[in-house]
Amino acid sequence: MATVVADMSVSLDGFVAEADGGVERVFAWYGKPQPESQPREGRCEPGASGLRVIVAGRRTFEQAEGWGGKHPTGALVIVVTHGIPEGWPREGAAVSFVTEGIETAMKQAAAIAGDGVIALATPSIIQQCLNLGLVDRIQVKVVPLLLGAGIPMFGKLTGDPIELENPTVVEGNGVTHLHYRVPDQRRAA
């Protein structure tokens, strides 16, 4: 069974991007040398441990210009969207599109991932999956930055508050990694 991981870089005040969608400052740590103790799977690097599928939204897909048809990690990308962009799908691209909603996308991701990792790569996808009880772990990369406004990571959660287990904390250069396990009672069977 796949492990579903919500994985995002965020400002200290909880924003994944500036109000205009800019992410340069939130992701500036990616260009800095990191200590050996930094978890590879948390950085979504090529060869990251067990990463098989990334589920993203249309906005992220467009901002990344479709990753040129292949995500840098080598993982398959499933884009949840209301409509398939013009010129897609492309032959040989490791990007597919789901127009039937998040539940269909997650079923497809699970079938592809097997016992590997499914990374959730956008706030709206993370929020929808948390609301459905589909998330096993939350990995946030907190950068020492206060944006004051922007796109929040957890802006539209529904239901009861989610109490997470104690985090694993890994200090990096310009980033602190916080890895939380979502308790079993919050996950769908």
Q: What residue ranges belong to the model's regions?
A:
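Enzymes that bind and transform nitrogen-containing heteroaromatic metabolites
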Residues: M1-A189
